[in-house]
Amino acid sequence: MALESNYNPDLFEKAIYAKWQELQIGNPDLQNVSISETHSILMPPPNLTGDLHAGHAFQHYLMDTLSRYERMNGRRNLWFPGVDHAGLQLEGVIDGLIIKGEFDTEINKLVDGINNESIEEIKTILASKDKSQLPLLLKQYLPSLWLDCAWTKVNMWRDNQKNQSAVLGDTPDYSRQLFTLDKKASDMVNFAFREYWEDSLMYKNSYLINWSVGLQTALSDVSGDTDFLTRKDPFINFIYKFESIKSIIKTNSDIHQLEDYFVNNPIEVATVRPETIHGDMGIAIHPEIFRAKLLDFGIDKGQVESLISDIVSKDLIVNFGIKELGVVGVQLIISEKVDKDFGTGALKITPASDLTDFDIWVNDFEGGEFVSAINKQGLLTESCGPYSGQDRFQARANIIYDLCKAGYVPLKEGFASGPTLESFNYTDYDKSIEVLKEQLAVFQINFDYEHNVTICERSKTIVEPLISDEFFIGVARKSVNTGLTLQEHALEGIGEVSFYPFEYQDRARNFIHTLKDWCISRNLLWGHQFPVWYNLAENPDRVFYSYQDWKSDDEVKNKIFIGDEIQLKEYINENNYSPSSWVQEEKRLDTWFSSSLWPLTTFGYKEYMNGNKSNDFGTFYPTSTMVTAKEIFNIWICRMIMLSKYFTSKLENTDNLYNKIPFKDLIIHPTILDDQGKKMSKSLGNGMDPVKQIDKYSSDALRMAMMSGMIPGRNMRLGGNLADKVCEKYRNFGNKVWNIVRFLETKEAFKTHLTNDFDPSLSGWWLISKYKQCLDRYEKAFDNYELSEALEALYQFVWNDLAAWHLEYLKVNDLDLPLTAHIVNDIIQLLTPFMPFESEVLWDNITVQSMAQTLRRVEDINHWNDQMSFRSKLVDGFDEIIKTVEGLRSVKGLFNIPAGELVNYTSTNQYVIENAEFIKMIAKGNAQNQEADDWYQITLFSKADVISLIKDKESEILRTNKQIIAVKKQKHILESTLQSRDFIDNATPDVIKHKYDDLDARNNDLALLEQKLKLLK
């Protein structure tokens, strides 16, 4: 068929994608292959709730481009698609939709006609404007209804994501698509859980964890679950007054001086969290500071050392308190872990609210039991006396006020007394702080203290460190079966993965070295439920026993079981246990628990281990390439390496996949920024809608625009006007390719055949040379995942070499039409990964077959590549023709001569002389045999007559002088900028390089203008 004047994506994209789906081009079982190698990519399972944004689009374009490249090269490729259930995030989104009333009809329909106290409470909230408590009540009393609401949205979102993938042109193997809550995934999760348990890596313990008050669940301490927020809070200094001394071995006279010291010198602390004082168990002070204070007080050095030793050994117990607020029995602790340079050098120890405090109290001081000041709802506990039940932030304001009122907060220097304080009863925290800032101005309180607080990434509420009974995976525990810790498995694997960019290998090692035990339990309804079963008749307290206890004690076997419901029934029947009282652990697993098993789950590790060696795991594991964003590098990538090494080390050591990493190459793709270099976000309103860009320009144009920034680890600016500019550039490029094919069609070039005895023209040999350079650059770039370089190689070849020079030469010598058609064929194939839709249309038009199923053909050109060394003079000759043309064009611009005006020139180069017709056509150059002394040197071999064409030499001299002044000014500004230490220290390498390139260009302009002026004079 004849091609239209321009490529119109609206006419083709939907039909082409439907054809790809019908052909199942992503299914490796149906692909044409020419080599035995396989290639696999795992799609990072996107969260269900996410609409397509720039980051998603970039990641999918990258994976699809890599997959198409591998298929084109004859490798059996599997791009495995998946969807993540997004535990915390989805539950938060569904709760929000319930609060907004989206499911009111369904809820009303179900509760109508049911009469009991809990349902009546639900009905009351449904009828009210404030539905904030409705999700909690549904999960408590009608969990199946909440889950029905969730699944309704899940199915809709999954369909939406597949539609978005179609717009992009994604070609994964959808016949293998896996959802992280599918049975295959659940089976692997349950299997892994039991493996951890049997290997003594799994345990349950009361420990200080990150607690999301907003989502009412535990969080891990890595990026993804938590984030940081910079905010201002009051930083308050206050004192603890001496209460008592109890000595086990010393007489009263021995401790009299110490008591006298403390009576006169109460301990001053500083904190941003005064609301936790009722959970204070101790006051830790650095020994150097404590020693210096006692010596200054006049206590003998020997006695000071003895007192410190007795306090450390607990032979001497010193208690402090804040009697007026009900804080008593706070014990003095000597600890080198206190930062002596921060605050007062003394630290209030609240083990239930701070990990450092917990470590000092439990591990160093061995202080025993402690109390919590804040509960899981973010309210103060019963141990807080009159503040019990207050919100943690409001309690902060109240306690600050009461500490000042009771005289425990020192005055600022220069103030002898404070104001009379009566009562304080504001309930709004921000308003409270404004009032306190004014009323308490004389006290040592910095109300504008700026610091970072940990927040829940999903709910954006401030995380509360709390003691909670949770499940953990111990990363530093030795595995019973493998003999290594998970950390050791991870570090071994990190050394085997190729990282792009390489510096991420060190980041991975640093993360693993500092990795803490993984809290895997979440108080959610959505997600994988723990495969833990308790027999309440024998284990009413739901004690989680170790595998060793379970295996060795028959009584314990009737108390707990690990497995799914079917396995439980079999277990009960085999052991003749009563089935009536077994209940499942209510907690859900951290979303990242299943995600970290992704390479094992998708390819079928469990089935492979059970003997199915020919499945996907045996064929495609380890994954060839893993693509990810830097934001989930620690929380996901490092864990996948750790757990994949752990599980594959359980295979027979003779197995080919024994102890294998999950992926060979790890690519950190760029973060997409807006045109000002800011990260895109909904709150800033600076995001780029990929669907709108596709509607405006085409999917191919957006793909190429994004891949033009694909350098591993680098950020890419692509937003606002810049996005339009880059998309337009590549839409124009697509049209350029389209019109090249149209031109060759009019010449019937694609009907010609290229034979081995074909002898190309001067331009043909030059084109072969340029094509070889392009091909080498293209393949090397793909090898290094620098797709921007591969695309640029094609862009420059098509636009500058093929279109600008060779096709123009065909107009005067069409000998090379067969060669040109052949190379354009190859270029269309090379463009397929970057421009799949248009390439499909062009290829179908030329060959009447599917490009998506066509293997790359580049071997035929090698016949001429082998002869290039004998034809280098021809290539050099065409290069000289190009220089002459460019010289003529440049000199016209320099001397302000119209482009269409003929300029006489001479040349001593034989190839330039022989191709005068081409030069005249393309550059309006008129070849001459003789030259005058004032002719301008345009190349090493050629001169041009421009002086005779200048009608007003004086005006041109004046204009040139002005240009020289302007260029010198620009040059001076650039030189000053590059000499600025501030600029060099703060600018990015790219910006600095751009400035140096600008300076080189200005120097070149100046040299040309000065040469011109000399000639004019």
Name each model-derived stretch.
Residues 1-294, 333, 350-383, 415-486, ...:
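N-terminal, positively charged nucleic-acid-binding surface of large information/translation enzymes
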Residues 3-5, 55, 82-83, 150, ...:
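Conserved short loop/turn motifs at secondary-structure junctions
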Residues 156-166, 188, 732-745, 764-774, ...:
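Core structural elements
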Residues 457-459, 672-676, 681-760, 848-852, ...:
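Catalytic adenosine-cofactor/nucleotide-binding cores of aminoacyl-tRNA synthetases and other
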Residues 846-1017:
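C-terminal low-complexity, glycine/proline- and small-hydrophobic-enriched intrinsically disordered tails
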